[in-house]
């Protein structure tokens, strides 16, 4: 009986140790992130690569800026006026997490005064031609500290606030492809600071949170509508010029073959 009584706690301790080991392994996997922003020729653009088990599972290149309204006292110290802080995403610490249907990127900077979390989901839709998978940016959360003096000057009720997206469906892309968009895009975030809306401005975006085949290599790009329209506007004059030139050549050729009498 004594041996059995001693064996049970040993088994329990072993289970606890295994659970702790599993938890630590998950934490280590989440923190396997590489910040390659130094490779970018654009000083405003950041590059993040999340790896799990030695394999790239999320890649993100983008420039981000946050427009944050906050209250300060007017010169009479009676009225409140609204100022605006422009906060750029800088090259700080980061945490990533990958999954089959959910992936996440978190970035912290200025001693964790600011934190950005981006959640991506992959979904299947029943279409007339059969099931179709897409992925999208489903949630953005931005945490900021208005007592941080670099961007905020004498903010009233200074402290940490959280701004969240609401029913977000952005960067929608067919599964297996990366999303690319050079144009600026804005996302509105409702702040815990009463009656304040934070604006997130994204640009020079190239993201793939799922189905990466080769390390550090994006899959085929799915371009945003704005970029496609701008590309068409750039190439259309060239196409029209070529057509006009061809018409002139054909007209001259016909004129020489059939000269007027």
From Swiss-Prot:
The chain crosses the membrane at residues 235-255. Glycosylated. Its main location: membrane. Glycans are attached at residues 35, 53, 126. It is a single-pass type I membrane protein. Residues 30-234 are extracellular. The keyword Amino-acid biosynthesis does not apply. InterPro entries: Lamp2-like_luminal, Lysosome-assoc_membr_glycop. GO terms for biological process: establishment of protein localization to organelle. Keywords: Cell membrane, Cell projection, Cytoplasmic vesicle, Endosome, Glycoprotein, Membrane, Signal, Synapse, Transmembrane, Transmembrane helix. It is found in: Cytoplasmic vesicle membrane; Cell membrane; Cell projection, Dendrite; Cytoplasmic vesicle, Secretory vesicle, Synaptic vesicle membrane. Plays a role in short-term synaptic plasticity in a subset of GABAergic neurons in the brain. This is Lysosome-associated membrane glycoprotein 5. It comes from Pongo abelii. The gene is LAMP5.
């Amino acid at each position: 009986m004594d041996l059995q009584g001693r064996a049970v706690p040993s088994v329990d301790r072993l289970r606890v140790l295994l659970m702790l080991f599993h938890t630590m392994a998950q934490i280590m996997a989440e923190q396997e992130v590489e910040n390659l922003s130094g490779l970018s020729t654009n000083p405003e653009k950041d590059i993040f690569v999340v790896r799990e088990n030695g394999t790239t599972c999320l890649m993100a290149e983008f420039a981000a800026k946050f427009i944050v309204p906050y209250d300060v006292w007017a010169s009479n110290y009676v009225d409140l006026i609204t100022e605006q802080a422009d906060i750029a995403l800088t090259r700080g610490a980061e945490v990533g997490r990958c999954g089959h249907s959910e992936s996440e990127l978190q970035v912290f900077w200025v001693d964790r005064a600011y934190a950005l979390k981006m959640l991506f989901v992959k979904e299947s839709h029943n279409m007339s031609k059969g099931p179709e998978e897409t992925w999208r940016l489903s949630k953005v959360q931005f945490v900021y500290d208005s007592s941080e003096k670099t961007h905020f000057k004498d903010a009233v009720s200074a402290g940490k606030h959280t701004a969240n997206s609401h029913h977000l469906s952005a960067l929608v892309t067919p599964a297996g492809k990366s999303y690319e968009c050079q144009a600026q895009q804005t996302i509105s975030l409702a702040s815990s600071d009463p009656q304040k809306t934070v604006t997130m401005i994204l640009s020079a975006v190239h993201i793939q949170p799922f189905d990466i085949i080769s390390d550090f290599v994006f899959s085929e790009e799915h371009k945003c509508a704005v970029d496609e329209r701008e590309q068409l506007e750039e190439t259309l004059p060239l196409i029209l010029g070529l057509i006009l030139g061809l018409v002139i050549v054909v007209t001259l050729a016909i004129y020489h073959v059939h000269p007027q009498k």
